[in-house]
């Protein structure tokens, strides 16, 4: 069977448990989920390296993932990449140049986006907690999570989406200090953070 398409998914690259953080409690990133005393900076191998990063939080863990601020042993991270080769097999899909971009043999290594942490336009995420009910522990696309931490030695600033997994809800809140607020950034258009499952990993 030959199907023409231009879309190529990323494929599973690796999965690693998030370990201890550094500088725990140094940046008191205050939110409805905690005063920041348990948050620290993740190890460099979990920072943005050009791949897609998918975070799965353990129950009752939280953090500011877009700024690489999480709790100790917060969960796991999967990286997916376009540089992983697709294995030819049943139901191969090719692009217009004849490149293999999907196959049933490799489908289990692709993230299956099954929903979104979908904050609607004009929702006041800075003064309200947004929650999504889920029957599974989601993998959250960190690349779509706004987050920034600044420190010039005198003034500390931060902003972004703080996320918490309760075991049945993914909860989020926009926080800011000495940086732009929600209404100045994304409130007018909203925000969609993909939520995925991985099958066969």
Segments and roles (model prediction):
Residues 144-180:
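C-terminal structured domain segments
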Residues 41, 45-56:
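The feature marks the first
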């Amino acid at each position: 069977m030959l199907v023409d398409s231009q879309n190529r998914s990323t494929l599973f690259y690796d999965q690693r448990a998030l370990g201890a953080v550094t500088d725990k409690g140094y940046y008191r990133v205050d939110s409805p989920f905690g005063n920041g005393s348990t948050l620290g900076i993740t190890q460099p191998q979990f920072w943005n390296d050009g791949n897609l990063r998918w975070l799965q939080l353990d129950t009752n863990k939280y953090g500011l993932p877009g700024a690489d601020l999480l709790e100790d042993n917060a969960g796991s991270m999967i990286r997916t990449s376009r540089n992983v080769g697709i294995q030819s097999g049943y139901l191969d899909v090719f692009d217009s140049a004849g490149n293999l971009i999907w196959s049933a043999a490799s489908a289990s290594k692709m993230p299956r986006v099954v929903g979104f942490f979908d904050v609607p336009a004009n929702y006041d995420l800075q003064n309200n907690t947004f929650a999504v009910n889920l029957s599974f522990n989601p993998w959250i696309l960190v690349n779509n999570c706004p987050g920034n931490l600044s420190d010039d030695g005198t003034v500390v600033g931060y902003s972004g989406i703080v996320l918490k997994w309760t075991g049945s809800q993914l909860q989020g809140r926009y926080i800011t200090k000495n940086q732009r607020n929600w209404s100045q950034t994304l409130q007018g258009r909203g925000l969609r953070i993909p939520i995925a499952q991985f099958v066969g990993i």
